[in-house]
Amino acid sequence: QSLEDMYKVLFNKISSMETRLYNLVSSGTEEDLTVLGPYFARNILETTCSILIGRIDPYRLIYVQKVQSLEFSINSKSKSAISWAGDVFGKDKNSKNKLWDSEKEYNSDGRAMLSLQYGEIYWNPAYKKLIDDTDYLTDASLENYRMRIESPENFIKYLRSECSSLYSSLSKGVHSELVMDSAIIYDKSTVIDLIYRTFKMCSTLGMVSHYIDLS
């Protein structure tokens, strides 16, 4: 299976979740929306991140596919699977001045998509290219990408903060960790806002990723 074929599978997953969300919002009951909305939205966020991991580090996606094609069981957790904590978010134990430390082993940092290291190498420069691209962006559309970011150097911090908050909020709607009535917290307006934030984040990640220099 080629990398292109894997992208098609992931794209079809996103397309399916988008259709389900659209049907929920437009014609579903409020109860179905509040129960299923967070699950569909988190699926879109996770799948988008998987695609972008493959864009930056194709080997990681190919590795997962190779392992799953040989042996895959729904009865046990796959140690090779892409995870939010390991592959997307990564660690944040270093100060800005200690990102590159000769005393640390290479494997201690990992290669998470939203790690501070990847932020400095890929995301921050790509975001700067985006907001400087006057041939593409108008002043009005540029405001959609400036958001709450004071400078391009802080873009990765914005991504980490927003993605962490969004993932946590969506997960609470998916897992049974609440001991109070979830409808009190996840009413229709809350779920609609989470869905909106999910699409905004996925769109932002996708747009900025096109400005990443992988040459």
Give a label for each model feature:
Residues 1, 43-55, 63, 167, ...:
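Aromatic-enriched hydrophobic runs in primary sequence
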Residues 2, 46-160:
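Short non-catalytic regulatory patches outside canonical folded cores
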Residues 2-10, 25-40, 151-162, 183-197:
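Non-transmembrane, amphipathic alpha-helical segments
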Residues 10-26, 30-60, 170, 195, ...:
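Short, hydrophobic, well-ordered secondary-structure elements
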Residues 17-28, 142-152, 172-180:
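Short, charged/polar, low-complexity loop and linker segments
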Residues 156, 172-212:
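Charge-enriched, short contiguous segments at helix-coil
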Residues 159-171:
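Short, well-ordered alpha-helical segments
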